[in-house]
């Protein structure tokens, strides 16, 4: 079941997020709360009353200190930015990530590109393949994390 996040979910989200490092950046509960306040969409996926995945989406009006978000702010006047999609390891490849994205794609946010980034270094080939299967293409690459990471900046270009 997909539902809006609540502050009572933060501990589960922190665990899911920490378990997914280095494919996502570390964030603490105060950052989760800030993202929650600014998000256009922040939902969790529950399986048998356990939060097993989440999706955070911001729009161009967010105040977010991220090189990747800043890249899209410079490129587009309006856009949606997928800050992160995280699925618990034991629930991956079961359609949960696809369900979260389908939920996002069916909402009407007007004619805005949907954007995200995926790590190239450290490599995350499963996420690249997943995003390509959801209609995303790489439009650029950039170094982040003081040059320790390289990301593919992606945009969704087709309806699935």
Task: Specify the residue positions occupied by each region the protein language model found.
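Conserved active-site alpha-helix within GNAT-family acetyltransferase domains
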Residues: 121-140
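C-terminal "cap" of GNAT-fold acetyltransferases
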Residues: 143-160
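A short beta-loop-alpha structural element at the N-terminal edge
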Residues: 1-13
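A short, internal acetyl-CoA/4′-phosphopantetheine-binding micro-motif in the GNAT/acyltransferase core
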Residues: 83-92, 119-121
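Conserved beta-hairpin
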Residues: 40-59
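Conserved acetyl-CoA-binding loop-helix of GNAT-fold acetyltransferases
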Residues: 87, 93-106, 133
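Conserved GNAT acetyl-CoA-binding A-motif
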Residues: 108-120
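Conserved acyl-donor/pantetheine-binding loop and adjacent beta-alpha core of acyl/acetyltransferases
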Residues: 56-84
